[in-house]
Amino acid sequence: MSANYDHVFVVVGDNSLRYTWEGGKSFQKTAGENKARSFLGLPGKQLDLVKAIYEKNKNLTVVYVSGKPISEPWIEDNIKSIIHAWEPGTKGGRSLGKIVFGMINPSGKMPITTARSVGQLVMVYNHKPTNYIHKYAFEKTKPLYPFGYGLSYTTFSISAPKPSKYTWNGKGSLEVAATVTNTGNMAGAETVQLYIRDKFSTVTRPVLELKAYDKISLQPGESKKVTFSLTAEAFAYYNIEMKYLDEKGDFIIYTGNSSAAKSLKKATIN
């Protein structure tokens, strides 16, 4: 039947409702409180359903409705468009309809990192830059979706960060500017994200730390300058004695539209 339509939308995901109880257990609930999972994929035969529909009609959009991350590499590799609606509430259907019919340009970003499989967990963010990285034998090293990732119906470019000074004593504030441009053909909004990396520190810090962000609405071809104001607190951390430390040194400042390395541009200050 799906072959007879110009485009097909299939809604899959998890169920967090408790409405079927047998012996004190909810067998239909697949997410939520007291429902730990040993895998990140779609429960049941939902992936088989998506594949069966895809065989009949390649113009397919998958909509995830879930309160947890869903990791299905096959869907990411084969389906043209994916919408993660999370748990949108009673008005979620109307909001989703506005998105799929182009009345709203989606601009959401992933609030978490989604691993490709449970074999990638736990993902380590605090590792030394000199540490040798071991690769998986049968799995990619990068996550399925990085933190801050999200597409829209238009495209954007974000310039490299431009600090107000490249040598800073930590007093006052450091202004960091970047320019974001709508390079597509539709009005939309982009979230400019600013990360830092401490090149040398007493304690091993995360490779990337989100310190500021701003969501900017742009018409096609329009550009806007975004300026972030950072204080010394943005570069400080807790040492091994749990004391908040403003340690001097070299820092890399990144700007981009997600935490993925390929989307980030940088500048170094000290």
Model regions: which residues?
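C-terminal non-catalytic regions of proteins with extracellular/luminal or membrane-system context
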Residues: M1-N270
